[in-house]
């Protein structure tokens, strides 16, 4: 147990069926559900086969319709979770589209997990997409998509390194060009980093970025939202269906400087977008849900440009 109240420890590890890795699989499962139907909310045809390849029974049953998406015994239903991930995914998709429309041809996805943007987005010719994550995660996704016959839609370069290690050197060694403008995303990552590691991550991004580079992430002002008893109550309901995960034990608590404030202090122009505005931009209304109200106050979306 860390001094900040998290069950996480420095240097801990996981796979895609446990701990932090299971949250990445849950995101992919939500993307898979949102990609179904005649008028899908998303277009991520790779999410479902990736989740099935992970093989966690809860997420397989979720895809098979054996777990109710909308039930009153959850403080935040899986249906609301699916909508949240839909909005978040589309925000980061559009961030990359805007960056490449502005001429940026180098993209970095930090903690890529089961993210399939290098395969499913329409990248301009000459775009290089770097995916950074733990070696086991990178290998699993690469091998699974290869078995499906999937081909990247950009030049995909994998950087198999833990973000707590010297990932900037590993990124450069894979051909990253720090003199070129870059579009960076850190989607759903920051809560799982200790406060000092979040600052170090942002400082490394700044050091690697040429003027005109762009970054998108979440801006978190209050980590207590992750330890609310209503959020913890989800664990007992999930456990009944076979998923023993408590997000409150996976995040790092304690005081941290909001990413937007840190970036502004290091030369970035920052735009903060309230959660309800981003929901509205994609045709959704933020549910009148106690947990989501707390998240709305504590977390916003952030885009930034250097210089």
Swiss-Prot record:
Superkingdom per UniProt: Bacteria
Record keywords: Methyltransferase, S-adenosyl-L-methionine, Transferase
Binding residues for S-adenosyl-L-methionine: 133, 162-163
GO process annotations (BP): methylation
Cysteines paired by S-S bonds: none
One family name in Pfam for this protein: LCM
One GO MF term attached to the UniProt entry: methyltransferase activity
InterPro entries in alphabetical order: Ppm1/Ppm2/Tcmp (IPR007213), SAM-dependent_MTases_sf (IPR029063), SAM_mthyl_Trfase_ML2640-like (IPR011610)
EC number: 2.1.1.-
Similarity comment text for this entry: Belongs to the UPF0677 family.
Protein role: Exhibits S-adenosyl-L-methionine-dependent methyltransferase activity.
PANTHER family: S-ADENOSYL-L-METHIONINE-DEPENDENT METHYLTRANSFERASE YKTD-RELATED, S-ADENOSYL-L-METHIONINE-DEPENDENT METHYLTRANSFERASES SUPERFAMILY PROTEIN
Protein name, entry field: Putative S-adenosyl-L-methionine-dependent methyltransferase MAV_2732
Organism listed in the record: Mycobacterium avium (strain 104)
Phylogenetic classification of the source organism: Bacteria, Bacillati, Actinomycetota, Actinomycetes, Mycobacteriales
């Amino acid at each position: 147990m860390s001094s900040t109240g998290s069950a996480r420890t420095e240097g801990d590890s996981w796979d895609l069926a446990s701990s932090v890795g299971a949250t990445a699989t849950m995101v992919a499962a939500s993307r898979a559900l949102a990609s179904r139907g005649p008028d899908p909310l998303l277009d991520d045809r790779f999410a479902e086969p990736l989740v099935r390849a992970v093989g966690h029974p809860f997420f397989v049953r979720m895809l098979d319709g054996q777990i109710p998406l909308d039930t009153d015994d959850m403080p935040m239903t899986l249906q609301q979770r699916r909508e949240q991930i839909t909005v978040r995914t589309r925000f980061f998709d559009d961030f990359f589209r805007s960056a490449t429309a502005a001429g940026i041809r180098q993209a970095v996805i930090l903690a890529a997990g089961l993210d399939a943007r290098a395969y499913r987005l329409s990248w301009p010719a000459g775009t290089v997409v770097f995916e950074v994550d733990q070696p086991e995660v990178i290998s699993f996704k690469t091998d699974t998509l290869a078995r499906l016959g999937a081909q990247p839609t950009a030049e995909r370069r994998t950087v198999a390194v833990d973000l707590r290690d010297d990932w900037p050197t590993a990124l450069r060694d894979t051909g990253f060009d720090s003199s070129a403008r870059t579009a960076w995303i850190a989607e759903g990552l920051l809560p799982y980093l200790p406060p000092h590691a979040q600052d170090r991550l942002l400082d490394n991004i700044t050091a690697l970025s040429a003027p005109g580079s762009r970054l998108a992430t979440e801006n978190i002002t209050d980590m207590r939202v992750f330890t609310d008893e209503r959020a913890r109550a989800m664990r007992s309901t999930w456990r009944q269906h076979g998923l023993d995960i408590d997000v409150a034990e996976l995040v790092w608590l304690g005081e941290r400087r909001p990413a937007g404030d840190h970036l502004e202090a290091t030369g970035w122009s920052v735009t903060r977008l309230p959660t309800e505005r981003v929901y509205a931009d994609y045709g959704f209304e933020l549910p009148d849900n106690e947990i989501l109200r707390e998240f709305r106050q504590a977390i916003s979306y952030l885009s930034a440009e250097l210089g």
